[in-house]
Each structure stands twice: as structure tokens, then as C-alpha cells.
């Protein structure tokens, strides 16, 4: 009873880390803080020898029976696994070739294991396949079912022998078949064979279905008791071991298995378990949706591109851009350090005032609004724009209200669901504090008509700079055009003046010519012949 009191007391004195989510109105994003890290820092290798027994020399020639069916399954599985092993060796050669590894790994269901982790695991598997290493592991397991063995390259591995099927075959099945052949009336014997054979057949199926590399650690590859012993042997602190034992399902999901090969009547494979060497440092997650401002049918849209998980590790801030690199269990976040990127401490400024920070906060821009929902740990961001119907609802009463166009933040206390057209999103029921940080949407700082074409993952200050440069070019073009128009006006005036002067000169010339050729009205008519001097004009 005393140990229960101790546990209850420890729970009472342990500080509770509540979650706090802030909605940043300026950038249509949320930051959720209060998580604690569980970061993978290494791998722990466990080598299994699953011993089948001398089934190849057992034969059933006395007709169909349950024993014969199970025996045929076992022999067929061994042959299949040998084929898988041969194919896997060829595939691993490609994995170690940098030019081909990404294509080969893309065809394997890696689950949450990274390509780098699998490549490292394959290197260890190649070492274990050496005849001297296989012999050393078998020798270490001659008198025990579990032993720590050191490979030739100095890597220490935990070796585990699984002998239940072999013991049943040698001590029970072989004796019964030799005595009564396969037509055994004892149904219990057939059922026992099936039970002992189940783990072996499931291991074969998993390696066969996944090309020799499993995406996680099943109970057949490693029982719960075997997992607990392996975790307890890990070179890490008691607190970290305790946390991993409490989250064995996560350890299984983050691990993977690699087939070593078939050696006689033994199947050898290795299991890579994650070592979570960093725990309880602060972590937070950033989520975002498009923020758009419209004008006369044109839009200026921005979306934060620094979304993902962030964790403190050894004084640095590690960013996990792929949300799948981290998984939560309660307020703990399990992440793979190999997938993280170190970023400056100033990156947090993007969560305060994205438009005035000196840090290059990354965004994507566009001129076409996209309606979407981004679920956050304590609510949802809803980007609702033209031509789309958006609403929030309750599981009990249905739709509560329609949402306005633009970016909205819905807490999981305000609603149970968010609906965009015919798609319904269920909000989480995680408890925590929610806050709204008011601010003018940064997208409204831009003129939608002059907003540039789509840009991906650029610094926000670069967007401002590009628009300023574009505006400067527009202003310069206007000045040049204005000057050209003024020059053209003067040129036209000169042409008109020249034309007027030219026309005037022509008219004057014509007038002079006409003037000269014109005679007075009273002059005598010009006559041909002799002049009459006696003619006296009237006065």
C-alpha cells in the first residue's frame, strides 16, 4: 500500500505543464507552447535468433492432416524467407549507393524511420552477416537466452535467442511423428504446433511484405517482455528509461526491423530501437493558414512557411519542418533529432510581430485565395474566401453559425466541428489556455492590384522590397511617360507653327502673284493692229 501512496504523492508534487495557444491575428497563425521534448539521440540494436528446429527432415506421407498442413507452412515460410533475404542483399547494395538509395528507400514502407537511420541500420546488418559475427552471436547464446555481444567494429548489441518453436519441434513434435506418423488423433498436439509456429510465420510474413525492412516493431518481432529488457539495458538515465517504458507503443512506432538472413534452421534479424536521450526541454508548434486581402476582385495572400515543431536542445533551437517527424503523447513530443534543423533563437520573433522583426520570417505569396482549415492542438484556423461556405458546429445541435470571409480562429471550446463546403473537421478536446494577439493582417499592407506573382518560401522583408522596387519602376515609367508626353506636345506645337507659317507664306505668295497680274478697271482694252492716237479716254 505504501508504494501507492508514494506514487500519488509524487503526482501531486509534480508540476503540471499546461498548454497555451496564442492566435496571431496579424499572420493568421497559432503557436502552441507547453510541450516537453523526448528527442531521439541514438539507436539500440537487438539481434534475434529465431530457431525453428529440424523441420526440413520431418515428412508426412500418410495423407492429409493438421500436422502436415502446419509442417508444410513452416517449410514454405523458410524457403520464402531465403528468397526475401537474397533479394534484400541486392536491394541493400542499391541503398548504400547514394545515387540510387532514394529510389530504393522510396519503395520501402519506412514508417517513421528516416532514410539515414535505415542506411545506418543496413551497415550494421552487413557486419552481423559476416560468418565470424554470426558464430560469435550463436556462441554467446549457447548457455543463455540473452547476452550482450560486441561486434568486430566495436558496436555492442543485445542478442536474444527465441527457442520455443525449436524446443517444441525437437522434444514433442518429432517424437510424436516418429511414433505415430502425422495422422495424430491428439488435437492438442496440432493446436500446440500452430501456437508455437505463429510467431515464426508472422515474422516471415512481415519481412516478406516489407522487402526485408519492417516499418515498426510488432509484438511478433519483439515481445513486450523482450522490449522492456532491451530498454532497461540502454545506456541512458533512469528517468529516460522510465519514460520509454511508459511509452512503449511510441518506441515500437519509431523503431524498425531488418532481416539478417536464414542460417540453417535459424532466422536471424535485428531490431533497431530509438534511444530518447533528451527529455523535458521546451517544445512548441506553429500552425498557419492563408491570410488574404482583396480589392476589386484582386487578392494579396500570404502564408507562413515556418510551420512545424520547435524544441530546445543543448541551448539551441531545433526546427522540424515535417510535422510527421514528431508525435505527441499527452504533453510530450517525440522527435527524431536527425530530422531537425538548427535555427536562430531570433526565429521566435516571427511569433510576436512578423511584419516588423529583423529576422527573415519565411512566407509564400499568391494572388489566388485558398480556403482551408489548419487544425491546431487547441482549435482551428479557418481561411474562408470567395465562393466557399464556412461554418462551425456542435456535435449535439449541428451548425452554430456561418463564418465571415477571411481568417478566423475557432477554439475547441467554441465548437466541436468546422465545415468548409461539404468537408467536416473535428476539433480536438485537449485542454489548455487560448489567447488572441490582435494585429492588422500583414496582407492588408499590400495593394492587391500591384501584388507580385506567386513566390514560395521567401523572406517577408524580401516581399516588401520586391513590391517597393516594383512601385519604384512603375513611378519611373510614369515619369518617363510624362516627360515623353510633354516632349511630344512641344514637338506637335512646333510642327503646327511651322505648318501655319508655311501655309501663311504660301498664301502671301499667291496673293502677291495675283496682285501683280491684276490690271486697273478703266484701262483701255488692248487691241491688235495699229494704235489709234486720236482716242481720248473719258475723264
Swiss-Prot record:
Q: Where in the cell is it found?
A: Virion membrane; Host cell membrane
Mind telling me which InterPro entries this protein's record contains?
Fusion_F0_Paramyxovir
Q: Name one GO biological process term.
A: fusion of virus membrane with host plasma membrane
Using the record, list the residue span of the signal peptide; answer none if the entry has no such feature: 1-18
According to the record, glycans are attached at 57, 172, 353
An example Gene Ontology CC term for this record: host cell plasma membrane
Q: Does the keyword NAD apply?
A: no
Q: Where is the composition biased (Polar residues)?
A: 529-539
Task: Spell out the disulfide connections.
Answer: 28-407, 60-182, 283-311, 292-301, 326-335, 350-361, 384-390
Which superkingdom does the taxonomy of this entry point to? Viruses
User: Which residue stretches belong to region Disordered?
Assistant: 520-539
- Residues that span the membrane, as ranges: 492-512
Q: How does it sit in the membrane?
A: Single-pass type I membrane protein; Single-pass membrane protein
Pfam families, sorted: Fusion_gly
Which keywords has UniProt assigned to this entry?
A: Cleavage on pair of basic residues, Disulfide bond, Fusion of virus membrane with host cell membrane, Fusion of virus membrane with host membrane, Glycoprotein, Host cell membrane, Host membrane, Membrane, Signal, Transmembrane, Transmembrane helix, Viral envelope protein, Viral penetration into host cytoplasm, Virion, Virus entry into host cell
The UniProt similarity line reads: Belongs to the paramyxoviruses fusion glycoprotein family.
As a miscellaneous remark, the entry gives: The cleavage peptide sequence for the hMPV F protein (RQSR) varies from the one described for other pneumoviruses, and differs from the furin protease motif (R/K-X-R/K-R).
Descriptive protein name: Fusion glycoprotein F0
Instruction: Provide the species name.
Output: Human metapneumovirus (strain CAN97-83)
Source gene? F
